[in-house]
């Protein structure tokens, strides 16, 4: 018990230290990326995606898959082509903030520590900061920032609830969670089957997820997949 209390205190102290120094770190990192970007050809969006693909290839692949699932769900909601394009962009950029998360934190072969989880939970805010530094549309910044909010208000970074969370962010959240469950094994968790992942989404409908988004998401799969 004493050792656990010491570890908890150490983690809390580390989190305070990280929080105190993180703003300066992020400002420097964003400025450096922006300076590099000004030397590259292409607009801010292209620069950020190239950086994500080069430095975080698994996150990039995940983002492309999330965009596919999100657009399919948007079609189920009756989105027109313009809104589908916006939704696809929001999905592709949803994890762009992980560019600023140290690679050692992203690739730990075990469950993250409380301090590492604290840093990971900052990535939506990092994404919004990057979008701002690179002059991406304000709507994209908002959708990037809120994809980890929860329907019941217990998410992050701002604890938004229900329809206060932008619909596109709610859609991306479901697609993001599904792909994270089925895509790959992790050292501390085996990949889910499609049926297992759908069952988990249904369990969390109305708490973590918008139940209408869950319904639309499931409807995008062929009937034979829904039964498996």
Q: Could you tell me what each predicted segment is?
A:
Residues 1-9:
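N-terminal acidic, proline/glycine-rich, low-complexity intrinsically disordered segments
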Residues 8, 16-228:
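Histidine- and acidic-residue-rich, metal-dependent catalytic cores
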